[in-house]
Amino acid sequence: MLHQDDEKEKFIFDIFNPMELDDVITTHKKVTALGKEAECKKLRNALIILDDVADDPRIARNEKQIHELYFRGRHHKLSVLISAQRYRSIAPQIRTQCTALFVFRLRSHLELEAVLEEVSATYDKKTIAGFYREATEEPYSFLYIRLEAKKPEDIFWERFEYRLLP
């Protein structure tokens, strides 16, 4: 069993630093490789949270690194959660790799249109807009969209609690 000493190993970073992110990714790849070599039944997962960074110029300069996380991270048991004030500020290549969306009340109709456009393969935009209004009606509530759901009725949720159906 591999253990982490939280006193010695930094795991929360207040400022985006591509070199520190590289260190985290490299370390986790090594941990995953060791687990595979030892034939561990359960490999360790890691979650990287990029909070409100979509407009951060350091992210734009290191877009390749972020794309790599989204495209290859799952092979190394790395998950990524990115939060943004504007949906469209997240690169389309990253949005297509997402497995879920959490859509809180949006400030712009253009942002809502962008979300509706990208998730309207199963239901029409009007239906999904209704789901959005219902899910975000209460303060702090959100529309949870399971992009990898196998059945249409499992895609749209109000928070994690109520399935939304037409």
Where are these regions (language model features)?
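P-loop NTPase motor core of the ASCE superfamily
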Residues: 39, 62, 111-166
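Conserved P-loop NTPase motor cores
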Residues: 2-130
